[in-house]
Amino acid sequence: MFKKLFGQLQRIGKALMLPVAILPAAGILLAFGNAMHNEQLVEIAPWLKNDIIVMISSVMEAAGQVVFDNLPLLFAVGTALGLAGGDGVAALAALVGYLIMNATMGKVLHITIDDIFSYAKGAKELSQAAKEPAHALVLGIPTLQTGVFGGIIMGALAAWCYNKFYNITLPPFLGFFAGKRFVPIVTSVVAIATGVLLSFAWPPIQDGLNSLSNFLLNKNLTLTTFIFGIIERSLIPFGLHHIFYSPFWFEFGSYTNHAGELVRGDQRIWMAQLKDGVPFTAGAFTTGKYPFMMFGLPAAAFAIYKNARPERKKVVGGLMLSAGLTAFLTGITEPLEFSFLFVAPVLYGIHVLLAGTSFLVMHLLGVKIGMTFSGGFIDYILYGLLNWDRSHALLVIPVGIVYAIVYYFLFDFAIRKFKLKTPGREDEETEIRNSSVAKLPFDVLDAMGGKENIKHLDACITRLRVEVVDKSKVDVAGIKALGASGVLEVGNNMQAIFGPKSDQIKHDMAKIMSGEITKPSETTVTEEMSDEPVHVEALGTTDIYAPGVGQIIPLSEVPDQVFAGKMMGDGIGFIPEKGEIVAPFDGTVKTIFPTKHAIGLESESGVEVLIHIGIDTVKLNGEGFESLINVDEKVTQGQPLMKVNLAYLKAHAPSIVTPMIITNLENKELVIEDVQDADPGKLIMTVK
């Protein structure tokens, strides 16, 4: 149950990134538009007073502001799109549902335009400060103020309606409304019910949120910033940080702007204060990112490079330079964080604590810098330096230098003191035991602590999954020495990455435990999977095309630590939008897992690719999959390989994200194209 809930939270967190991804563009428009009539800048560049320039700046500012003003609607549409696999019908249903939900709440609670507007000086002016802040005008509808929470709720419900009813059949006389056309209809009914329910349930929630907001922001804000920084970074590996920071950025706190509008949420308040030209009071939950993203993590990258073995410095240097520069410029830190998260968790613990102190220090110094994307140099210029007199952004530089020094020396000390296997410090060569292929299942069973220590045994095409009684009896180093490319430990659950032979090992281990296999000569592990390295260097150059219609995401965003950590190899994540997986190149089918959820292919030039459809889909036991090919069959690029029931997978698997891994990259170079929207004819990767 927890695992399923965790998977759903990951999907929601990922879905929230879609509306959040719009904010950088809106923020840039707002920041530049506002900056173009900034008094200090106008004094330096008087030409900014030109009427045409003033009009352009006003349009830019208004274009950016309207996005922030309608965030709840964007969250409704974005959440629905994310949870429904990107189908536009779900987005339309969310839009309709959001409007109906707000209209329903307004009518049930008898909210009128007079509850929103006050009349003064003969004109209608928005005066939320003098009215009930629990009410709002949403796209012309007087209603209850539910903020982005209302948008997320309606978006999630619209996605549920889509996944539940998108292929519904109706009697012939209602046939026009069958299938996807039925989704907005049923969503409308759900929206009415939701509006009625929220009319009575949301006011107490509002009171609770306001009380929590007052406690966190007014009574104990200093401690809150520290705790916020720790929790936000701690959730990065699980992909749940988007869920955590959303209330702080978009709901907690309130400010009435010069137009009389009530603005909620730390990020939105900062943007409103930027436009109003008043001193900043918001930014406590954004500013803390700048010191560790721009200075701390790049310094940590240098410490990792410095401690790499001499023969590995060139490779590690390139990796760390790229990751460190990305963190500095854009605030995208996952490539760097994931480079040491799995191999040296103690470093990530240090990083989490330092991130918390960064938020605390920035708050104590009164630095207030907003952001839309992340705490990199680009946002620092737009929202910090251009407003340096109000934001006190210059203090980030000395504080950042201190953090760079602290990060460097703490990482350097920990790496040497605890002999951490950071990039470039891995064992030069894992000793391979003198174990015949046939004896491998016996040796793996012994390394897991023996028959009595096995509580549950399972496998998929990438890994051996074992739940043990006593984890202390497991010889992790021994498992790696037997050929596992990595071992993941979650509680008493061990995942050993043996690649395609994992299922054969599991099969033989089960037979050994039951007494059906008593000697190595009776095992079924094949010769080709044993003493020879699992990976074979590819020959030639291979173009790899998209395996279907969908979205391409970085491998680091795949919600599975084994794939995201590149334990199986490098590649990309693919989010299918249609239920057909096709061949990414001309080649041969090498493996089809018994549960049909994974396919191994080999190109004509020798590149081996694993397509793993969904996450934890091995547990579906083949339900939702229809194989269209056989092992050893020749295939051509674009040829259908598998039919997939996406609706079934969305309902029964943690995620439909499909890792596409190059399993024998070795010393070859993988070039990943800058592609997001993909179809079978689009190039996504090249192995050189």
From Swiss-Prot:
GO terms for biological process: D-glucose transmembrane transport; phosphoenolpyruvate-dependent sugar phosphotransferase system. One of its GO terms (molecular function) is D-glucose transmembrane transporter activity. The EIIC domain forms the PTS system translocation channel and contains the specific substrate-binding site. This is PTS system glucoside-specific EIICBA component. It comes from Staphylococcus aureus (strain JH9). Its EC number is 2.7.1.-. It holds the Pfam family PTS_EIIA_1. Residues 560-664 form the PTS EIIA type-1 domain. PROSITE patterns: PTS_EIIA_TYPE_1 (PS51093), PTS_EIIA_TYPE_1_HIS (PS00371), PTS_EIIB_TYPE_1 (PS51098), PTS_EIIB_TYPE_1_CYS (PS01035), PTS_EIIC_TYPE_1 (PS51103). Residues 3-427 form the PTS EIIC type-1 domain. It is a multi-pass membrane protein. Keywords: Cell membrane, Kinase, Membrane, Phosphotransferase system, Sugar transport, Transferase, Transmembrane, Transmembrane helix, Transport. The phosphoenolpyruvate-dependent sugar phosphotransferase system (sugar PTS), a major carbohydrate active -transport system, catalyzes the phosphorylation of incoming sugar substrates concomitantly with their translocation across the cell membrane. This system is involved in alpha- and beta-glucoside transport. It comes from the Bacteria.
